[in-house]
Regions:
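Bacterial Sec-dependent N-terminal signal peptides
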Residues: 1-26, 204
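Short loop/turn motifs that connect adjacent beta-strands in outer-membrane beta-barrel proteins
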Residues: 19-21, 71-78, 115-125, 172
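Short glycine/proline- and aromatic-enriched beta-strand/turn motifs that initiate or cap beta-hairpins
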Residues: 19-67, 207-209
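Predominantly the C-terminal beta-signal and adjacent terminal strand-loop region
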Residues: 22, 33-41, 75-79, 85-87, ...
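Residues on the lipid-exposed face of transmembrane beta-strands in outer-membrane beta-barrel proteins
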Residues: 25-31, 60-68, 84, 107-113, ...
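Outer-membrane beta-barrel translocator domains and adjoining extracellular loop/strand segments
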Residues: 35-44, 91-98, 121, 140-148, ...
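Surface-exposed loop and membrane-interface regions of Gram-negative outer-membrane beta-barrel proteins
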Residues: 48-53, 80-100
Length: 209
């Protein structure tokens, strides 16, 4: 038992010694939309369900993040990512545009594979990441009406699961990704309906190596 504990401590120490921490800034554009689901009964008591997705609106995001990189082998490493960003989400249905502004806190696990030299761009890597994202509602509107949060209004807390796929360059420390965010919580509605926020877009980051 003591030997196993010693091996675990040595392994953890070696990983910490190899680990690297990086900071970065990120911004981008997206096409956020929401998915509506409701259920009820018709006049005959038969269950009726309704599901639709809104049209997308123009979304933006920007913020800062940190990466904790642990090399596994020369060509492959794992990263833990955390950060904070401002985002515009929402959607549009039948002329009613919902714009919601959130402060988001992403937490993702990244897998990075080094491709080697990529012409004049220098060393490049491909990356894939997945993780939850917690958002706190700051404000918003439905056409000209201001959104109200809390009881009788919209839910201020939003949670989604985000997926990123992209490339990273070392000579010019830039990272570009495409992403999809799947809403897990409803931002508003009665107990028989839900409205979940989804998002798809592109993001560009600058890394301070």
């Amino acid at each position: 038992m003591r030997c196993l504990l010693l091996v675990a401590l040595l392994l953890a120490g070696s990983l910490c010694a190899m680990a690297q921490f990086h900071l970065g800034i990120r911004s981008g554009f997206s096409a956020p939309y929401y998915t509506h689901y409701s259920e009820g009964k018709d006049l005959n008591g038969v269950k009726v369900e309704s599901r639709y997705s809104s049209s997308a609106i123009v979304g933006i995001h920007g913020g800062a993040f940190g990466l904790y990189e642990v090399p596994i082998v020369d060509e492959f490493s794992l990263e833990g990512e955390g950060g904070v960003q401002f985002s515009r989400l929402g959607g549009s249905v039948a002329g009613v545009t919902t714009s919601l502004y959130y402060m988001q806190f992403p937490m993702r696990a990244n897998a990075v594979y080094k491709l080697g030299e990529l012409g004049s761009a220098g060393p490049a890597s491909i990356l894939a990441s997945i993780g939850p994202q917690i958002g706190i509602g700051l404000g918003g509107s439905m056409n000209q009406y201001t959104v109200e949060w809390g009881e009788g209004g919209m839910n201020r807390l939003n949670v989604d699961l985000s997926f990123h796929l992209g490339m990273r360059f070392s000579r010019i420390p830039l990272q570009g990704t495409v992403f999809y965010e799947l809403g897990l919580t409803s931002y508003g509605g009665s107990k028989h309906e839900s409205n979940t926020l989804n998002n798809v877009g592109i993001s560009v980051a600058y890394l301070f190596f």
